[in-house]
Amino acid sequence: MRKMVAGLAVLGSVLTACATGDGGDRGDRGDGGAKPAGMSWAYDEILDEGSLSDVLVNGADDVWAVGTVPDSTDPSAGASPGEVSGASSSDGFLLHRDGTRWQRQPMPAVLGDSVHQARLDGLGSGGLLLTAAVQDTTTSRTAHWDGKEWAALPKLPDGGRVTEMKAFAADDIWVLATLSGFRHWDGTRWSAVALPDGVTVTTLDGVASDDLWAAGFRSTGDGTDGHEMQQPAAVHWDGKAWRQTDMPEYRFPDPVPAEPSASIARVLAVAADDIRAYGTHSFNHGEGVDEPEQEAVRLRWDGSRWSKVADAEGDCAGRVPEARDGDRGLFLDDDRYVTADGACTKIARPRLPDGDGVRADSRQVLRLSAREPVPGTGQVLGVGSVQVNQGGDQTTKAVVVSLKR
């Protein structure tokens, strides 16, 4: 951990490197794809170990990042996959940039000694929520930063791990969690959200406290009637009540494959009249002959109704957005990017500099866990890790990157 923290002195270049860059991007080896023109990631900081799981940008002078470093005293730390079962212990670390430099911040005591799957959610006015799971990842804990100090958010009534969160204020927080289900925090207590019969939601997003969407699927049968077992479903909060909205249905042509279903995995609120829903129409593969291709579920709310829309083209087809790039486009998985006019490209990945334990013949994989635009600047920051494989010697380094356009 001491080595990693020592590298923070040079992290002050994060918010300026986006515009300058060094033009030295060689891409990651073994990728097999042509290098795209226009955009690439550039390393702004390389930490000695661990990984960063999330970043929150309230402004150029208020940026947070959270990550973990495996506990070197834990017997499973450093073990090869399959050698030790179960989750290992991890030390969490928190970074904050005030516009001048990055500084290490102490983790809230409420999160305990071992931190997993940490996420950051903004509250406005400099406040934020930091949520992390315990070692076995079955339960989450949340801490609230009000700009001056940390305080524990009361535990969910039935426990469980937070899988989705949308927060508008310290007294207006919506979560989806295992065991506890769909809950709302009003500043005083957690209350359960009642959903229409048969509806299950798995994703949340919204543009305002009175304009929130939750989406997933509704159960429609057991499939024995030759129809889908699930269909896409979405409910909307207008500040007073939840209301289910009608969504188009998906059907496979005859002969219908085994156990067909369609559902939403991600809802993305671009504007009040532009809500995107992404999912899959699939089935139990291998149960029949001449099976159809599964298809992408792509739906859009225009302010009055949901309609089917075409999927992205080329290598962006079938991919789900992971972050917005303002009104320019969307970041997809595996560093694909689709522009506002539908063009698909791949963001080039840099290699780590040779030296400091990294060999020139190493194979490297950059994995970003979060990307976040810097408001009002056109800049984008990303955090994650780089896995370095070199002749059986494997290491992972936490990284901060910025987008070169």
Segment roles from a protein language model:
Residues M1-G24:
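Secretory targeting and sorting signals
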